[in-house]
């Protein structure tokens, strides 16, 4: 099996030609097989038909490029409402939205921050928790997700 980043990159390039973005790839052991979970999106949002189409495209890319050896399980899904934020473009796209940020190392005796994405550029993002604006370099972020407040 190729490196996970290489698999993600090849699949992302193939899907980009069809207007889809690979937001994240999670690989887990599932018994004797590997489970590959691709989270995909597109401009304007993704629906069930898009997910099915993306799944078929991912499967054909994996087979054509011989990316994975042996038996595997493939899942394609939308990123969901708590979608992961990995690239500067993700943070820029969701300026004004609520997010939860987990840092690799603690600052001010904490590693978790929640607030609105107040800004983003190529090297860092700004999070406003209502009282303070924090600037975090992307390289210092361990995990970032949208964290919407759901009202019923």
From Swiss-Prot:
Places the protein is found: Cytoplasm
GO CC term (a single one): cytosol
Coiled-coil zones: none
Bilayer-spanning residue ranges: none
UniProt cross-references to InterPro entries, sorted A to Z: Ribosome_maturation_RimP (IPR003728), RimP_C (IPR028998), RimP_C_sf (IPR036847), RimP_N (IPR028989), RimP_N_sf (IPR035956)
Keywords on record: Cytoplasm, Ribosome biogenesis
A matching Pfam family: RimP_N
GO biological process, one term: translation
Family: Belongs to the RimP family.
Function text: Required for maturation of 30S ribosomal subunits.
The protein, known as: Ribosome maturation factor RimP
Origin organism lineage: Bacteria, Pseudomonadati, Elusimicrobiota, Elusimicrobia, Elusimicrobiales
Gene: rimP
């Amino acid at each position: 099996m190729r490196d996970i980043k290489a698999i993600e990159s090849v699949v992302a390039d193939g899907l980009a030609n069809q207007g889809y973005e690979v937001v994240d790839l999670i690989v887990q052991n599932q018994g004797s097989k590997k489970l590959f979970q691709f989270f995909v999106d597109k401009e304007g949002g993704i629906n069930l038909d898009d997910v099915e189409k993306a799944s078929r495209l991912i499967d054909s890319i994996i087979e054509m490029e011989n990316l994975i050896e042996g038996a595997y399980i493939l899942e394609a899904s939308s990123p969901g409402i708590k979608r992961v934020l990995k690239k500067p473009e993700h943070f820029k796209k969701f300026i004004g939205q609520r997010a939860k940020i987990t840092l690799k190392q603690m600052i001010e005796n904490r590693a978790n921050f929640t607030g609105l994405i107040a800004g983003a550029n190529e090297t860092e993002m700004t999070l406003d928790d209502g009282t303070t604006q924090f600037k975090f370099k992307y390289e210092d972020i361990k995990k970032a997700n949208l964290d919407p407040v759901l009202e019923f």
